[in-house]
UniProtKB/Swiss-Prot annotation:
Highest taxon above the source species: Bacteria
Key words of the record: Cell cycle, Cell division
Keyword Cell division set for record: yes
Keyword check for Lipoprotein: no
Gene that this polypeptide is encoded by: minE
UniProt cross-references to HAMAP family, sorted A to Z: MinE
Protein name (record): Cell division topological specificity factor
Function: Prevents the cell division inhibition by proteins MinC and MinD at internal division sites while permitting inhibition at polar sites. This ensures cell division at the proper site by restricting the formation of a division septum at the midpoint of the long axis of the cell.
One Pfam family cited in the UniProt record for this chain: MinE
GO biological process: cell division; regulation of division septum assembly
InterPro entries (alphabetical): MinE, MinE_sf
Length: 89
Protein backbone atom coordinates (compact mmCIF):
# COMPACT_ATOMS: atom_id res chain seq x y z
CA UNK A 1 0.00 0.00 0.00
CA UNK A 2 2.86 2.35 0.74
CA UNK A 3 4.05 1.94 -2.83
CA UNK A 4 0.65 2.95 -4.24
CA UNK A 5 0.38 5.98 -1.99
CA UNK A 6 3.90 6.99 -3.02
CA UNK A 7 3.07 6.73 -6.72
CA UNK A 8 -0.34 8.40 -6.57
CA UNK A 9 0.36 10.92 -3.85
CA UNK A 10 -1.15 14.26 -4.79
CA UNK A 11 1.69 16.74 -4.85
CA UNK A 12 1.09 20.44 -5.15
CA UNK A 13 1.14 21.62 -8.74
CA UNK A 14 4.27 23.45 -9.78
CA UNK A 15 2.24 26.26 -11.36
CA UNK A 16 0.42 27.03 -8.12
CA UNK A 17 3.68 26.86 -6.14
CA UNK A 18 5.36 29.23 -8.61
CA UNK A 19 2.39 31.60 -8.44
CA UNK A 20 2.56 31.65 -4.65
CA UNK A 21 6.30 32.35 -4.71
CA UNK A 22 5.81 35.16 -7.22
CA UNK A 23 3.11 36.75 -5.04
CA UNK A 24 5.49 36.67 -2.07
CA UNK A 25 8.27 38.27 -4.12
CA UNK A 26 5.95 41.03 -5.39
CA UNK A 27 4.66 41.74 -1.88
CA UNK A 28 8.22 42.02 -0.55
CA UNK A 29 9.22 44.37 -3.37
CA UNK A 30 6.24 46.62 -2.69
CA UNK A 31 7.04 46.75 1.02
CA UNK A 32 10.73 47.30 0.28
CA UNK A 33 10.00 50.63 -1.36
CA UNK A 34 9.88 52.43 1.96
CA UNK A 35 11.97 55.27 0.59
CA UNK A 36 10.17 56.53 -2.49
CA UNK A 37 12.19 57.56 -5.51
CA UNK A 38 10.65 61.03 -5.66
CA UNK A 39 12.02 62.30 -2.33
CA UNK A 40 15.45 63.45 -3.61
CA UNK A 41 13.83 65.27 -6.55
CA UNK A 42 11.25 66.85 -4.23
CA UNK A 43 14.04 67.98 -1.91
CA UNK A 44 15.89 69.70 -4.78
CA UNK A 45 12.71 71.40 -6.02
CA UNK A 46 11.89 72.66 -2.53
CA UNK A 47 15.39 74.10 -2.19
CA UNK A 48 14.95 75.92 -5.52
CA UNK A 49 11.52 77.33 -4.65
CA UNK A 50 12.39 78.42 -1.11
CA UNK A 51 15.67 79.96 -2.30
CA UNK A 52 13.70 82.22 -4.66
CA UNK A 53 12.14 84.00 -1.69
CA UNK A 54 14.48 83.41 1.25
CA UNK A 55 18.21 82.80 1.42
CA UNK A 56 18.34 79.43 3.16
CA UNK A 57 20.99 76.76 3.62
CA UNK A 58 20.00 73.57 1.71
CA UNK A 59 20.98 71.51 4.76
CA UNK A 60 18.27 73.30 6.76
CA UNK A 61 15.50 71.69 4.69
CA UNK A 62 14.61 68.22 5.94
CA UNK A 63 12.06 65.88 4.33
CA UNK A 64 10.82 62.59 5.72
CA UNK A 65 8.06 60.17 4.79
CA UNK A 66 6.49 58.26 7.68
CA UNK A 67 3.97 55.43 7.49
CA UNK A 68 1.36 55.03 10.20
CA UNK A 69 -0.93 52.13 9.44
CA UNK A 70 -2.38 52.79 6.00
CA UNK A 71 -1.49 56.52 6.08
CA UNK A 72 1.68 58.11 4.79
CA UNK A 73 2.75 61.47 6.23
CA UNK A 74 5.17 63.75 4.39
CA UNK A 75 7.01 65.92 6.90
CA UNK A 76 8.85 69.00 5.62
CA UNK A 77 10.94 70.98 8.11
CA UNK A 78 12.54 74.26 7.00
CA UNK A 79 14.77 76.23 9.37
CA UNK A 80 14.62 79.88 8.35
CA UNK A 81 17.47 82.26 9.19
CA UNK A 82 16.73 85.03 11.71
CA UNK A 83 17.13 87.82 9.16
CA UNK A 84 14.46 86.23 6.93
CA UNK A 85 11.97 86.30 9.80
CA UNK A 86 12.77 89.98 10.48
CA UNK A 87 12.19 90.86 6.80
CA UNK A 88 8.67 89.40 6.92
CA UNK A 89 7.62 91.55 9.90
Amino acid sequence: MALLSFLFNSKPKTASAAKERLQIIIARERNGRAGPDFLPALHQELIAVISKYVKVNPDDIKISLNSQGNLEVLDVNVVLPDDAIEAVK
